[in-house]
């Protein structure tokens, strides 16, 4: 009898798992083999070889990721940037033009402005809150629109449904980076996005021990992206596949805890006299709060804030806290703290960061699984020193 797999918690544990179990192993084994015996395949891309991303470890992940977002297909990659690169090279091709949200992850921004020109591709940035202005950015060679579910690092929520509708009206591919939300809080295919991209390094894995990426969406597009990735080589090795697969099984438990803790911490920061601004879509005063409520099942574990003392106060705060680790990245079990100006968005010039609203004193917090009460007490102590 087929196993009943409906809810997302059940999908995390059972979707895509081999039936029958391989050798009876309850935990998916690692297939640490670069190649597999020829079995009569007639297509190059069907040959069983790690670079084709078609080992048993890859296949389980692809099926599980597609099931989580109620999408048609998925492919894992060697990093989040490998996933973004393979997707955009495929969709834009030679000479394609992209319309992108103006506040994005620093690595994505650098790809757009530094590498795109070398590949004959171009980008124009748009205000994600102003759909009426997007048409001005369209060119004859525009191929896609790119947004983030929750922007990094200002936690903005663009008009995502408008992005989907705009793409459909203009024959574009709609692409979203869903890393900050995760499939627990948002499933882009359900509102019509063609492609959803993740840095699997973050929430999907959740244990800060691998680098990985994923593209989820329409089967025809994912197949093309898979072929591109095969040629570019940005694949995920079987051991990393195993760690990603293991981490995903606890995704719901982790993300729901992080949702709850981040909201509690954001509300506390919002009331503190030393804090001038808190960016978290779960706060009623956030400009995109109502939109986030309509779209998401939770508001995520990421927030950012500014202190009254600006850069100096931010540097002192980051040095004084004792629980958060001062490091880039996010989505793990440990709370991480960083200033985007000298980590995730260091590749942007000061002028570019200023235009994006990213001050040098902005502090970004990735809330982990520690006690939220302990974190708040730690923050209170660090702020009280001044």
Q: Where do the PLM segments sit?
A:
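Conserved PLP-enzyme active-site core in the AAT-like
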Residues: 2-3, 73-274, 279
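Positively charged, small/polar-rich N-terminal and surface patches that mediate targeting and assembly
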Residues: 2-9, 216, 277, 331-332, ...
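Conserved N-terminal alpha-helix of the aminotransferase class I/II PLP-enzyme fold
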Residues: 35-85, 107-115
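Glycine-rich phosphate/pyrophosphate-binding loop
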Residues: 30-31, 39-60, 67, 336-361
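Conserved small-domain helix->loop->beta segment predominantly found in fold-type I
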Residues: 263-331, 348-354
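N-terminal glycine-rich, Lys/His-bearing helix-loop that initiates the first secondary-structure elements
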Residues: 1-48
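Short, well-ordered beta-strand elements within core beta-sheets of diverse protein domains
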Residues: 243-253, 301-308, 364-368
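PLP-dependent enzyme catalytic core of the Aspartate aminotransferase-like
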Residues: 113, 122-123, 136, 140, ...
């Amino acid at each position: 009898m087929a196993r009943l797999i409906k809810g997302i918690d059940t999908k995390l544990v059972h979707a895509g798992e081999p039936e029958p179990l391989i050798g009876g192993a309850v935990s998916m084994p690692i297939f640490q083999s670069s190649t597999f015996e020829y079995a009569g395949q007639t297509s190059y891309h069907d040959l069983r070889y790690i670079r084709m991303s078609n080992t048993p470890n890859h296949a389980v992940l692809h099926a599980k990721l597609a099931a989580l977002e109620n999408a048609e297909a998925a492919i894992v990659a060697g990093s989040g940037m490998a996933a973004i690169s393979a997707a955009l090279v495929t969709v834009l091709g030679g000479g394609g033009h992209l319309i992108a949200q103006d506040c994005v992850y620093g690595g994505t921004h650098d790809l757009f402005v530094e590498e795109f020109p070398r590949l004959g591709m171009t980008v124009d940035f748009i205000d994600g809150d102003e759909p009426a202005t997007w048409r001005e950015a369209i060119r004859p060679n525009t191929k896609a629109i790119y947004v983030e579910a929750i922007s990094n690092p200002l936690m903005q929520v663009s008009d995502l449904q408008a992005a989907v509708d705009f793409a459909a009206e203009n024959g574009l591919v709609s692409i979203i980076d869903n890393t900050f939300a995760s499939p627990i809080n948002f499933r882009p295919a359900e509102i019509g996005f063609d492609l959803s991209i993740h840095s699997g390094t973050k929430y999907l894995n959740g244990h800060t021990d691998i680098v990985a990426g994923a593209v989820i969406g329409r089967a025809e597009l994912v197949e093309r992206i898979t072929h591109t990735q095969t040629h570019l080589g940005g694949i995920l090795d079987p051991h990393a596949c195993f760690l990603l697969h293991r981490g995903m099984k606890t995704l719901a438990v982790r993300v729901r805890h992080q949702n709850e803790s981040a909201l509690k911490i954001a509300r506390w920061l919002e009331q503190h006299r030393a804090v001038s601004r808190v960016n978290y879509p779960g706060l009623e005063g956030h400009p995109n709060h109502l939109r986030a409520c309509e779209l998401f099942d939770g508001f995520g574990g990421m927030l950012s804030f500014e202190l009254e003392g600006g850069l100096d106060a931010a540097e002192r705060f980051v040095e004084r806290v004792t629980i958060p680790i001062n490091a880039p990245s996010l989505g793990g079990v440990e709370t991480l703290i960083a200033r985007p100006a000298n980590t995730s968005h260091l590749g942007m010039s000061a002028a570019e960061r200023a235009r994006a609203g990213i001050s040098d004193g902005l502090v970004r917090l990735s809330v982990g699984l520690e006690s939220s009460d302990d974190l708040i007490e730690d923050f209170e102590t660090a702020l009280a020193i001044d």
